[in-house]
Amino acid sequence: LTGLPTSAITVNTMLMGGGFGRRAEMDVIKQAISVAQAMEGTPILLTWSREEDMTHDAYRPAAMGRVRAKLEGDRISAFDFATASSSVVESQAGRLGYAIPGPDGAIVQGAWEQPYRFANHRVTGYRAPVMVPVGSWRSVGASQNAFFHETAIDELAHLAKADPLEFRLRQIDDDASRAVLSAV
């Protein structure tokens, strides 16, 4: 980007708390290089306000989820979860000039790694291309997929005429997860 040898460049990276996905973006680096080149020989400090950061950031991907399930008494015997969103990995890699060769696992994050044990369980993720830049906001796919998943569990509890917490506990065989839900 600069045309300079790496030995002529010094970068002092600030330690920060949660970057929430923002550290994966390179636009701030390009801006810092432009400012440094315009002020040759002068050390620079580039800081974005929270408002500037949010203005220049990529969006969280829009998503859609659909669940089909089968109840047998108070147990879920089949859970078929489909989710679609744009690919964060594809969008971020594209901004760096790369393409991803296959599926983006972030689309199904939070959909399959659940403590519930169903006799029949399927998760399908669909990449839905959009023309809007998307980025890895905190938890990427788990945000929307956990919402879709848990909302479906609530709806199934309602159909089973069961208390949502008790219904969940009947579906979970992981002791640590049961302990967390029981403690709340």
Task: Describe each PLM feature range.
Residues 1-184:
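Structural alpha/beta core scaffold segments of enzyme domains
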